[in-house]
Amino acid sequence: MVKPVRKAVLPVAGIGTRFLPVTKAVPKELLPIVDVPAIQINVEECVSSGLRDLIMVTSRGKDALIDYFDHAGELEDLLERKGKQAELAMVRRLNDLAQISAVRQPETRGLGHAVLCARAAVGGEPFAVLLGDDLFEGNPPGIKQLLDVYAKYGKGVVGLWEVPVGQEHLYGIVDGEPVGGDVFRLNKLVEKPEPGKAPSRLAIAGRYVLPPEIFPILANTQPGRGGEIQLTDALATLCASDGLYGVRLRGERFDAGDRAGYVLAVLRYALRRSDIGAAVRAGAEKLLRET
């Protein structure tokens, strides 16, 4: 019987150099997608997929991420006194959205090391990992698509998306065999292959469901590209020793860790809003005509 997945790890310790100078004072995960930060979108993806026990891997200067989901007594009292019930309900909803805890990554040593920092909090059970730079809109949600594959095969699963031709060297790329629909049994993973040497165009998409066996593998993984412990290197070892699956995610993906991708994400989410969508569309079309 496959053990159910109850926990999710959200690595949020990155400095956010691509968004300087704003990230000098504000964690990049709190940059708004209209009026909701990217981290909330990922937390809600977890919750809507049945994951309410969430572990954030933070670093120095990232306490605001935990504060965002914590009770804000003075703010709530103020909103109540002013009769702003809609805003009060919005704030209180954040308090009860999920059970969120934090562990520290004491130094920047890569994504693999960030996941390893959550080892004690996760314990000996399978868990999900969501990268905050990758935003997904899908039905079912992105991580739920992985959970369904994990429940069927009982092996680690990575989310996949098809990258444009010529951009394979920018991503972790997989080689695999289709086993039905959008699911693949993976043969190997390559972190940012040299141009022209990628085994496919299927890239790892910032969503993972992993068995606890990944932790000892991570602990023994030597620093790779950039002197960091790469999660992809550990996944390659897991793939060879225990097997690994991939699922091509159905839905829309935005790379909110890139300036252009971030702006596109804001625009897309704004266009879908019933309160501002029409005005944003009209304004954007006017700007395009004038540019």
Language-model regions, residue ranges each:
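N-terminal glycine-rich phosphate-binding loop and ensuing alpha1 helix
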Residues: 2-84, 141-145
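Conserved beta-loop-beta/alpha segment of the NTase-like Rossmann-fold superfamily
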Residues: 75-80, 85-176, 212, 219-221
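Alpha-helix/helix-capping structural signal
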Residues: 14, 60, 134, 141, ...
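Residues at the starts of beta-strands that form the adenosine-phosphate
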Residues: 7, 52-54, 99, 126, ...
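Positively charged, low-complexity intrinsically disordered leader regions
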Residues: 2-8, 278-285
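Catalytic-core segments of class I nucleotidyltransferases/pyrophosphorylases
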Residues: 128, 147-151, 178-282
